[in-house]
Amino acid sequence: MIDFSKMPCLYWRDATKISYLQRRIIVYSIMYYEQNESCVSDQYYDSISHQLVELQRTCDHAEFRRSTYYYAMYDFDGNTGFDIPSRLTKYDREYLTNIASHVYKQWKASTTIKQRRRALNANTKGFR
């Protein structure tokens, strides 16, 4: 879960918070469903997905519509992200796919195999 009560997030509008969570979820979805890789546990993905759904539900609808990826995530319910990449514009899909590749490469280069296994299997029994 992202703590928006700290700097610089403290001053973000709801649309900015929503856009931030949307981008993270899209990047992790591309990484998982299209690149067959992951750098976050299922539990973490679920927590930020539910945080996004709650924020979208409680904020003003006009504010929600201002979010960057509203057009692709207007009906996101937190259950799965498999279809999100296919909803993106060509430009956004290429841009976020590049980010996903970079994030995974950086994560892999900065962690050991043991650290990666521990991170991906946080709060689960056995390995995925």
Question: Each predicted region: which residue ranges?
Answer:
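Phosphate/adenylate-binding "loop-and-lid" substructures adjacent to NTP/NAD/dNTP-binding pockets
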Residues: M1-R128
